[in-house]
Amino acid sequence: MLFKQAILVATTLTTLAVATPVVDVRRRTDPASSCSTGTLNCCNSSGTVEDKTIAGLLGILNIVVSDITALVGITCTPITVVGAGGTSCTSQTLCCDNNNFSGLITLGCIPININL
């Protein structure tokens, strides 16, 4: 019986380890007026992983980040066409490398200075 429990625990931990995303995003060096390597996003807020709120959210979502110095965008929506009618961003415009978390968290971001 103890052997079965040990196998169950080992299998569960292995599954969790494989399913937990590990993100390696380094500092972005794109100019602040272009977004050639990522996606343009309108984010409600942004900050670094040292920010307690962002660190807590990353922890709750089991998102492991390593050596990230770029900004993290929170609650972002993609901006598809710059200057098109109806497109506006009243919050923060960011260019982000990694949006694998349905817009809730975007990683590897830099601020973009454009008027939408």
Swiss-Prot record:
Record GO terms (molecular function): structural constituent of cell wall
Gene: vmh1
Keywords, ordered alphabetically: Cell wall, Disulfide bond, Glycoprotein, Secreted, Signal
Function as written in the Swiss-Prot or TrEMBL entry: Aerial growth, conidiation, and dispersal of filamentous fungi in the environment rely upon a capability of their secreting small amphipathic proteins called hydrophobins (HPBs) with low sequence identity. Class I can self-assemble into an outermost layer of rodlet bundles on aerial cell surfaces, conferring cellular hydrophobicity that supports fungal growth, development and dispersal; whereas Class II form highly ordered films at water-air interfaces through intermolecular interactions but contribute nothing to the rodlet structure.
The protein's name: Class I hydrophobin 1
Family per record: Belongs to the fungal hydrophobin family.
Upper lineage: Eukaryota, Fungi, Dikarya, Basidiomycota, Agaricomycotina
Glycan attachment points: 44, 100
Cysteines engaged in disulfide bonds, as pairs: 35-95, 42-89, 43-76, 96-109
Predominant cellular place of this UniProt entry's protein: secreted
